[in-house]
């Protein structure tokens, strides 16, 4: 301990130090640490601070550079917060008291309440409920134009151009034709309005289609057709197979004999697995549909809420004696936007419209703004400052003669092209082109660009945060190991298990029908077989049976209809053929376990709400009654089932779950923890399986308490959990299972490529530490020669203090930390932990919750100011994906929720390499070149205007008017400039082969103040050469200076585009010649625009003049002088200091 460098200097722990600490913490108030304590719900550790005095006086930090200087930071933060409370407290009080009333009056948001819904009687509803209409439109007929204009003019630049355009209606400020300013602005607005109108019309059509869908409504007089938008709370709605459920309903009846049905929820939660739903038993037992109106029944439903995975309610039938009460849970609900997958269902509507779960969970994601857009915005502000400075300089040199303020405003108008209005249009069109290229890339099929505004972010990433299961791995589970405590079975010894199972059930089959199958192996122990072998055989039999029974898997059988060719689902007891059977479950782990029991001889052939059937190797079908089912939850991390063997009437409670949840439930053993660690180090996902045999009296007592808890309206979940926990005691440990999730194709080379590109990779997973570490090594996220620092579990501030010090002394090692330790460290040492973790080549966070994943992303963005990317495939990754600067979703076996919420969607992890190295890199470099060239285009013409005005005694007279100004940024130069989106410095194959090229992009050298200043100097040089050249060489033909300078300007811009291009595309050549042709053709039609001061001088362009040799060689000379030096400088730079890509492209 003596050689450790403490995070805070440790001094004597005397009474004075304790007093200072107490004073410090008492005065600190509810600072940031208090906020974090509330967020993470951790216990206060202040009582233990005497063990390790962490915060001392400021003197303790002197001359100790190794210590973190968080005490001054804490004091500054405390003082700032105190000042904020003093200044803002009164203001907030006034605003709250004065504005709350106004807000309440304006909004009057309806309070959501619990409700009582009578079956088939909408008129009995006590309150008015929203219409069941879907409305995704942003505007209506009256708000469309004002809304779109507001969205555009809330940005400073657009508002600036509007003010400039409106100024031309003032005669004293008018400096040209109105359309010179209104045409570009109108074009931008027209494009935006057209795009919004198309999107709005598509939304309107989709809404109309959904709201007009017809459903059968059950009434006293029979079935009637009703539109989805006309459905009300209390209606009884019939939904056919493959039909969308129109509103949130309670499941009353189904045509399926089992009283249950399957629904698809991929449009609600993104999960592709079917969900089993159960009808209310009271209404399912009714003989006919019409009997629903002959009973007096109602549903009590909780108030509408966001959580799609929970529901609390009751079903009550009043006309029976005594009244029937049934508890309702999530399995009795049919949420809107889900699809009925089997049978026909009847439900009573409980929530409609904006109160449905699907609508309440629909929110507009935060609009992500790319770093390049922010950088261009800063440069635009610099241009605006240059505009103001230049105008002031011109007025100053004019001597403030006359109405100088009017001249100042006129100069602002003359030089307004310094800020290019076409910049945003060009960049938006470029982003659309990049998205199209990404989706058309045959090397990454299935890639979808869902956010077209940030493709350049793919080229600036520094941190990549990835999920493990389904992202780095295939999410295809294969059963690999079964451990019984004394013996372990792997893939090469599975035939032994199959032999044990076969012998066990053959022995059972030879016994009388009343024989207990579970005791068969024990009775065999009386034979001549050694005792150990019989014991192992018995344990194998019990373990396999437990795995085959404890799950939520349902076998589904498909049969081909002869005439229609449609697929229908038959009853399971009609056909047990293996080739027709598929399994449906909420988790691929469940399916893997059931498939394994099938491979060793015990097959799940049928399952409904009340029973489950298993087929033994001898062909005998065993039936088990399902008494209770306890589904898996992320909080409990386990699931259980109580079954009764019909042949023996034996009641057994089976349970399986994660080792952390099961270790305190099972009986004492000395092997579980060790073997879980061993399997995890092999990269296996482990599950602990246990059982407990119940007597009839024990079960009846439990069932009564459980039913009572399920009928509770308040704190139902807590009461139910407490009852279930009463059974989870001293359970018999049966086995430990290991399932392997194999790596996706090309994960290793992809991760290596990303590391070589300078991207730091963090793996955030909910799996256990050993498994996460093993996957990190096998995927080469952490190289085998690299040290790994496993952050030991910490629960207090002092432990976190010591562990951070230990970690701080290590260099170039990967960090592995658990979610619990992460919470503690972030509570006390947020900045320090992030600072240290960012220095690691790789970080693995295990046992992470979805909230923690998103918080880690947010911390990285705030502390590093670097661009982050999150990639995942499941619903638990959505918050992380949305929190990152760039979110990538993978369409995997866990569904499409992550893919739909992401900015980019891919089908395999290996596609991220090409997405970043090729498309991300090209998008950033192209947009950087395009943005700077568009600004250059405005700067050069403004420079020429400044020279022109200075020559004419600083007069605020426009050099170019009318169509020349409109055409300059459109038909004359738009196509060549926009063709820069096709440019590339290296071939895609070279960019992938040398990912080090990507590392240069993170420095932002393609678009920086340095490159911006270079383009400013180029613009000033070229603008001055063009204008002074035109004035000097054409002294005798001075009236033609507009035509001369403008022609040289267009040629210069075309040559500059050619000079900027690094790889020619045939469309670039077409764009160059097309623009040149348009300009030459316009000379014959726009001759009135080519005279200087047409009204004053009366000069027009002589067509014969531009065909003379003198005109041509002088224009050519001016153009060459403006471009040749730049080409020479570029050539010398590439020879003397070549960029990295030039060595590969040569």
From Swiss-Prot:
Membrane protein topology class: Multi-pass membrane protein
Reactions that this protein is recorded to catalyse: ATP + H2O + phospholipidSide 1 = ADP + phosphate + phospholipidSide 2
Binding site for Mg(2+): 467, 469, 873, 877
GO cellular component, one term: Golgi apparatus
Active site: 467
Cofactor(s) listed: Mg(2+)
SUPFAM superfamilies documented for this protein: Calcium ATPase, transduction domain A, Calcium ATPase, transmembrane domain M, HAD-like, Metal cation-transporting ATPase, ATP-binding domain N
Membrane-side (Extracellular) residue stretches: 165-172, 403-407, 960-961, 1033-1040, 1087-1105
Membrane-spanning residues: 144-164, 173-193, 382-402, 408-427, 939-959, 962-982, 1012-1032, 1041-1061, 1066-1086, 1106-1128
CDD domains: P-type_ATPase_APLT_Neo1-like (cd07541)
EC number(s) from the headed UniProt entry: 7.6.2.1
Positions bound to ATP: 467-469, 590, 632, 637, 656, 685-686, 765-767, 847, 853, 876-877
Region (Disordered): 508-535
Subcellular location(s) of the protein: Golgi apparatus, trans-Golgi network membrane
Biased composition (Polar residues): 508-519
Ranges facing Cytoplasmic side: 1-143, 194-381, 428-938, 983-1011, 1062-1065, 1129-1146
Tissue and organ distribution: Found in most tissues except spleen and muscle. Most abundant in testis. Also detected in fetal tissues.
Keywords, alphabetical: ATP-binding, Golgi apparatus, Lipid transport, Magnesium, Membrane, Metal-binding, Nucleotide-binding, Translocase, Transmembrane, Transmembrane helix, Transport
Group of enzyme by EC: translocase
GO terms assigned for molecular function: ATP binding; ATP hydrolysis activity; ATPase-coupled intramembrane lipid transporter activity; magnesium ion binding
Pfam families to which the protein is assigned, alphabetical: Cation_ATPase (PF13246), E1-E2_ATPase (PF00122), Hydrolase (PF00702), PhoLip_ATPase_C (PF16212), PhoLip_ATPase_N (PF16209)
Annotated PROSITE patterns: ATPASE_E1_E2
Similarity-based family: Belongs to the cation transport ATPase (P-type) (TC 3.A.3) family. Type IV subfamily.
Name listed for the protein in its UniProt record: Probable phospholipid-transporting ATPase IIB
Gene label: Atp9b
């Amino acid at each position: 301990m003596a050689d450790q460098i403490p995070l805070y200097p440790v001094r004597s722990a005397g009474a004075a130090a304790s007093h200072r600490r107490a004073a410090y913490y008492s005065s600190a108030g509810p600072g940031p640490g208090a906020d974090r304590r509330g967020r993470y719900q951790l216990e206060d550790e202040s009582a233990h601070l005497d063990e390790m005095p962490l915060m001392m006086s400021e003197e303790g930090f002197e001359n100790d550079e190794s210590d973190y200087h968080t005490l001054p930071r804490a004091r500054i933060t405390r003082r700032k917060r105190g000042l904020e409370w003093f200044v803002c407290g009164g203001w907030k009080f006034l605003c709250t008291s004065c504005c709350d009333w106004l807000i309440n009056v304006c909004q009057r948001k309806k309070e959501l309440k619990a409700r009582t819904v009578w079956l088939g009687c909408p008129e009995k509803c006590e309150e008015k409920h929203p219409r069941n209409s879907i409305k995704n439109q942003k505007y209506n007929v009256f708000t469309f134009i004002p809304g779109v204009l507001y969205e555009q003019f809330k940005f400073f630049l657009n508002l600036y151009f509007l003010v400039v355009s409106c100024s031309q209606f003032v005669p004293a400020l008018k400096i040209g034709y109105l359309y010179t300013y209104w045409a570009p602005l109108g074009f931008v607005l027209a494009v935006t309005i057209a795009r919004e109108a198309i999107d709005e019309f598509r939304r309107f059509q989709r809404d109309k289609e959904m709201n007009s869908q017809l459903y059968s409504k059950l009434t006293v007089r029979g079935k009637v057709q009703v539109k989805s938008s006309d459905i009300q709370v209390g209606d009884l709605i019939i939904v056919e197979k493959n039909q969308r459920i129109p509103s949130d309903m309670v499941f009353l009846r189904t045509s399926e004999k089992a009283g249950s049905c399957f629904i698809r929820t991929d449009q609600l939660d993104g999960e592709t697995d079917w969900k089993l739903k159960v009808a209310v038993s009271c209404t399912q037992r009714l003989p006919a549909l019409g009997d629903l109106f002959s009973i007096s029944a109602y549903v009590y439903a909780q108030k509408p809420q966001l959580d799609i995975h929970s529901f609390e309610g009751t079903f009550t039938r009043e006309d029976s004696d005594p009244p029937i009460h049934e508890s309702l849970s999530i399995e009795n609900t049919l949420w809107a936007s889900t699809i009925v997958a089997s049978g026909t269902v009847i439900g009573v509507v409980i929530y409609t419209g904006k109160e449905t779960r699907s609508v309440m969970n629909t929110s507009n994601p935060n609009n992500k703004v790319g770093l390049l857009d922010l950088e261009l915005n800063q440069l635009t502000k610099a241009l605006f400052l240059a505009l103001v400075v230049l105008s002031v300089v011109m007025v100053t040199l004019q001597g403030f003669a006359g109405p100088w303020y009017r001249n100042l405003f006129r100069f602002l108008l003359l030089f307004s092209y310094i800020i290019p209005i076409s910049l945003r249009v060009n960049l938006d069109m470029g982003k659309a082109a990049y998205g199209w290229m990404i989706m058309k890339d045959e090397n990454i099929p299935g890639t979808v660009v869902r956010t077209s505004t940030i493709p350049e972010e793919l080229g600036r990433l520094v941190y990549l945060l990835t999920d493990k299961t389904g992202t780095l791995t295939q999410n295809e589970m294969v059963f690999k190991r079964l451990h019984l405590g004394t013996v372990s079975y792997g893939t090469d010894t599975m035939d032994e298990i199959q032999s044990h199972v076969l012998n066990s059930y053959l022995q059972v089959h030879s016994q009388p029908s009343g024989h207990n199958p579970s005791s068969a192996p024990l009775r065999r122990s009386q034979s001549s077989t050694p005792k150990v072998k019989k014991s192992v055989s018995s344990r194998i039999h019990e373990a396999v049976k437990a795995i085959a029974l404890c799950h939520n898997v349902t076998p589904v059988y498909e049969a081909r209809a002869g005439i229609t060719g449609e697929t229908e689902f038959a009853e399971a007891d009609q056909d047990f053929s293996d080739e027709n059977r598929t399994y449906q479950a909420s988790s691929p782990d469940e399916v893997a376990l059931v498939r394994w029991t099938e491979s060793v001889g015990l097959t799940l052939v049928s399952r409904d709400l009340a029973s489950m059937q298993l087929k033994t190797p001898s062909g005998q079908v065993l039936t088990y009654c399902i008494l209770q089912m306890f589904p898996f939850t992320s909080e409990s991390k386990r699931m259980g089932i109580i079954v009764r063997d019909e042949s023996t009437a034996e009641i057994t409670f089976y349970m399986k779950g994660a080792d952390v949840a099961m270790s305190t439930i099972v009986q004492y053993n000395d092997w579980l923890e060790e073997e879980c660690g061993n399997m995890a180090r092999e990269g296996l996902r482990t599950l602990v399986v246990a059982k407990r045999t119940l007597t009839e009296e024990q079960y009846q007592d439990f069932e009564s308490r459980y039913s009572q808890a399920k009928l509770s309206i308040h704190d139902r979940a807590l009461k139910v959990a407490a009852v279930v926990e009463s059974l989870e005691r001293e359970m018999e440990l049966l086995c430990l299972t290991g399932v392997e999730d194999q790596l996706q194709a090309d994960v290793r080379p992809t991760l290596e490529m990303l590391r070589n590109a300078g991207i730091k990779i963090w793996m955030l997973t909910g799996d256990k530490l050993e498994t996460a570490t093993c996957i990190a090594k096998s995927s080469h996220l952490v190289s085998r020669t690299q040290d790994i620092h496993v952050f030991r579990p910490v629960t207090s501030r002092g432990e976190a203090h010591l562990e951070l010090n230990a970690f701080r002394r290590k260099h170039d090692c990967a960090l592995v930390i658990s979610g619990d330790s992460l919470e503690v460290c972030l509570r006390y040492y947020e900045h320090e932990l992030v600072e240290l973790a960012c220095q690691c080549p790789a970080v693995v966070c295990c046992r992470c919750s979805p909230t923690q994943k998103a918080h880690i992303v947010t911390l990285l963005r705030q502390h590093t100011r670097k661009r982050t990317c999150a990639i995942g495939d499941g619903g638990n990754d959505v918050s992380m994906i949305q929190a990152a600067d760039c979110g990538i979703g993978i369409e995997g076996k866990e569904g499409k929720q992550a893919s739909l919420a992401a900015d980019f969607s891919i089908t395999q992890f290996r596609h991220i390499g090409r997405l970043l190295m090729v498309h991300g890199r090209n998008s950033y470099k192209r947009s950087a070149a395009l943005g700077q060239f568009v600004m250059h285009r405005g700067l050069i013409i403004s420079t020429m205007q400044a020279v022109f005005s200075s020559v004419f005694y600083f007069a605020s007279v426009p050099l170019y008017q009318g169509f020349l100004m409109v055409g300059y940024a459109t038909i004359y130069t738009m196509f060549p400039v926009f063709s820069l989106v096709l440019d590339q410095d290296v071939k895609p194959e070279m960019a992938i082969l040398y990912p080090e090229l990507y590392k240069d992009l993170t420095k932002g050298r393609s678009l920086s103040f340095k490159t911006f200043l270079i383009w400013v100097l180029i613009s000033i040089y070229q603008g001055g050469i063009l204008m002074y050249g035109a004035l000097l060489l054409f002294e005798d033909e001075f009236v033609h200076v507009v035509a001369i300078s403008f022609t040289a300007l267009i040629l210069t811009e075309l040559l500059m585009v050619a000079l900027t291009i690094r790889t020619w595309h045939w469309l670039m050549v077409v764009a160059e010649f097309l623009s040149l042709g348009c300009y030459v053709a316009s000379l014959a039609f726009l001759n009135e625009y080519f005279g200087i001061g047409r009204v004053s001088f009366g000069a027009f362009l002589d067509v014969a003049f531009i065909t003379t040799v003198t005109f041509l060689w002088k224009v050519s000379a001016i153009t060459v002088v403006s471009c040749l030096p730049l080409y020479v400088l570029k050539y010398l730079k590439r020879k003397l200091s070549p960029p990295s890509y030039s060595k590969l492209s040569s």
